[in-house]
Regions:
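Central regulatory/effector-binding core of bacterial HTH transcription factors
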Residues: 1-57
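Short, well-ordered beta-strand segments
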Residues: 2-4, 49, 74, 95, ...
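Hydrophobic hinge/microswitch elements
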Residues: 5, 116-159, 165
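Alpha-helix/helix-capping structural signal
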Residues: 7-8, 77-78, 99-102, 128, ...
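Tryptophan-centric aromatic hotspots in well-structured domains and transmembrane helices
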Residues: 13, 57-58, 101-107, 124, ...
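Acidic, Gly/Pro-rich loop/turn segments at junctions of secondary structure
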Residues: 33-95, 99-102, 108-123
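A late-sequence structural motif
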Residues: 162-201
Length: 202
């Protein structure tokens, strides 16, 4: 079974959980790749797609909600000054990623605030580089909670203002004609269970 998803999702959310799947389903071999485009699913080179619900899919692909997308500022625990309010971020060095250049603007709008210079700060190509820069004390980053859960757990990063829902979610994409295939059902069911366990407890 071939799963395609963004590299940041694979590295930070799925790969840390793969051993659990292999223990539960040793007869299902998984391959991971980053060609997370609907065309790969339609051509048959990919069995399961994981992507943001903000991306449109053709009618032939069934979309199944997986994880609510929440985002928030993260920084090193000893980084100073730590922001105590959303407004305080306006004067602090912010980190950006090319893969989601509008992340800060979307977060600020959700908070009901605006920054005079939204593009202020360092721009990095990949989320992993941005998070490493944040952990190294180079500024404050903006990232989904599910992609920083390991770094938060290890104490390399903190989320001083918490996370807020973006209105989107990560979703599973499968061909509608294949939804009853046993291995796909097992895989989708396992991913859904893992997602449920990862959701913050209310």
């Amino acid at each position: 079974m071939v799963i395609a998803a963004p590299a940041s999702f694979l590295a930070n959310w799925l790969i840390p959980r793969l051993e659990l799947f292999e223990q539960a389903h040793p007869n299902i071999q998984l391959r991971l790749q980053t060609n997370a485009r609907p065309e790969a699913l339609l051509s048959g080179t990919v069995d399961l797609l994981i992507q943001s619900s903000s991306q449109l899919l053709p009618d032939s692909i069934l979309s199944l909600p997986l994880l609510v997308e929440r985002t928030g500022p993260v920084c090193a625990p000893d980084w100073h000054p730590q922001p105590r309010s959303a407004e305080a971020l306006a004067a602090l060095p912010r980190l950006h990623t090319a893969s989601h250049s509008a992340a800060w603007q979307e977060w600020a709008q959700a908070q009901g605030i605006s920054f005079a210079n939204m593009a202020q700060g360092r721009a990095l190509d990949h989320l992993s580089l941005m998070l490493e820069a944040a952990a190294s004390g180079l500024g404050i980053a903006i990232a989904p909670d599910l992609l920083v859960e390991r770094e938060l757990g290890r104490g390399r990063l903190i989320a001083p203002l918490g996370f807020i829902a973006t209105g989107y979610h990560f979703a599973l994409g499968i061909l509608a004609t294949r939804q009853e295939e046993p291995e796909l059902e097992i895989l989708c069911g396992w991913l859904t269970q893992q997602a449920h366990e990862a959701e913050p407890q209310k």
